[in-house]
Design a protein with these regions (language model features):
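Hydrophobic anchor at the beta1->P-loop junction of P-loop NTPases
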Residues: 5
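NTP-dependent small-molecule kinase module
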Residues: 21, 131-196
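P-loop (Walker A) phosphate-binding loop of NTP-binding proteins
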Residues: 8
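ATP-dependent small-molecule kinase phosphotransfer cores
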Residues: 29-115
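Walker A/P-loop
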Residues: 14
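ATP-binding Walker
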Residues: 11
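A glycine- and Lys/Arg-enriched "phosphate-lid" helix/loop adjacent to the NTP-binding pocket
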Residues: 96-156
Length: 196
């Protein structure tokens, strides 16, 4: 099973991804986490330089690189699927779509970039007002995390895509344990359904 935990910057994706993997393991399920962008790969290192404003590229190139970062790791993802792992993604192709829409790119073009990547069985969007995102991390923000108007557009993109793609929206503006319990309820129901 492939699960993506999505949302704008500082919505709690990393924390909730880690809690979900821990819970899955406690239930005897082989589970692992993958995060994107993955800054350890050659493309990931280039993305890091772009996000820190060290180098500038056209917006289309940036989104092609986000996709290429996943393609670099496609063999690893497929290997984990083959080994029957449940993979929980802290961002996956869904982020590229939502951020791309915020940059006025075509959803068809964005989807084509990721068309042959392994697709998720479940996508959970942690919804958070951008003003709260900005309060959660006030220092060392990347170029996207600093722009309130941009984050508002990204949030709008996630909500639109969620309704079109049957993604599940969870209110991320709650205590960590409450959000985790809501996510676990959704995931455990999906796991039961998959076993039937």
């Amino acid at each position: 099973m492939l699960i993506a935990v999505e949302g704008i910057d500082q919505s709690g994706k990393k924390t909730q991804t880690e809690l979900l993997v821990k819970k899955l393991k406690e239930k005897g399920i082989n589970a692992t986490k993958m995060s994107f962008p993955d800054y350890e790969t050659p493309v990931g290192q280039l993305i890091k330089r772009i996000l820190s404003n060290e180098i500038q590229v056209p917006i289309e190139v940036k989104h092609m690189l986000y996709s290429a970062n996943k393609w670099e790791l496609k063999p690893k993802i497929e290997e984990l699927i083959e080994q029957k792992y449940t993979i929980v993604f802290d961002r996956y192709y869904q982020s590229n779509w939502a951020y791309g829409l915020a940059n006025n790119l075509s959803i068809d073009w964005l989807e084509n970039l990721d068309r042959d990547l392994p697709h998720t069985n479940l996508t959970i969007v942690l919804d958070l007002p951008p003003k709260i995102s900005l309060k959660r991390k006030e220092q060392n923000r990347d170029i996207h995390e600093q722009d309130l108007e941009y984050l508002l557009r990204v949030r709008k993109g996630f909500i639109k895509l969620a309704s079109e793609n049957k993604w599940v929206i969870v209110d991320g503006n709650q205590p960590v344990d409450t959000v985790h319990d809501l996510i676990w309820k959704i995931v455990s129901e999906r796991l039961k359904h998959n076993l039937q």
